[in-house]
Every structure is written in structure tokens, then in C-alpha cells.
């Protein structure tokens, strides 16, 4: 399945679609929680007019993200995370984060 995130207001540009991305993030998290694979795909914006024509979008409706969602082919288990102290710093670069 594809979800096409669109706006109907304003002149189309990548900045004006910024309000869509928090909703897209929530959809990605929800898909993951349901065991589905999903990703944000904005590459169609390089061919905006052709993409909108192929999707059959009416005039004034502009797509900003396509989210393909489906069942993964391989193993889709829990995410493994490393320690934060190697990637999160406190106050300045290289100073390990001291969690409370």
C-alpha cells in the first residue's frame, strides 16, 4: 500500500510540506508497532509534475511524501540499540552524557 501525503494550500516547495512530516513520523512508528515495514520516500519530488500526473492528483493538490507500507520479506525483530554515551554528549562534543 502507498500513502501519499498531500497539501492543497500554498505554492509547492519542500519547506511548505514540513507540517506533513510529524504526521508521517507517527505513521511510521504505528506501522512498526503493527509489524509492518514502511519508509518515507520524498524522491518523487525531483519529478514533481510527472509524479502528480501519474498519481492523478487534481490541480492545486501537491504531494510531499509517499509512504510505502507492507509486510517485510525477512526477519523483522526488535531494534537493537547501543549505549547512549557514544552518540550523545552533554554541554560539549566528547563529554559523555550523564543520565539522571
Which role fits each region the language model picked out?
Residues 1-100:
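Acidic, surface-exposed loops and disordered segments
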Amino acid at each position: 500500500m502507498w500513502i501519499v501525503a498531500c497539501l492543497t494550500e500554498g505554492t509547492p516547495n519542500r519547506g511548505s510540506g514540513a507540517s506533513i512530516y510529524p504526521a508521517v513520523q507517527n505513521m511510521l512508528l504505528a506501522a512498526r508497532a503493527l509489524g509492518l515495514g514502511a519508509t518515507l520516500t520524498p524522491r518523487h519530488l525531483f519529478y514533481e509534475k510527472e509524479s502528480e500526473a501519474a498519481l492523478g492528483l487534481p490541480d492545486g493538490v501537491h504531494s510531499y511524501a509517499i509512504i510505502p507500507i507492507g509486510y517485510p520479506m525477512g526477519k523483522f525483530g526488535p531494534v537493537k540499540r547501543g549505549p547512549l554515551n557514544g552518540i550523545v554528549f552533554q554541554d560539549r562534543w566528547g563529554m559523555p552524557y550523564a543520565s539522571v
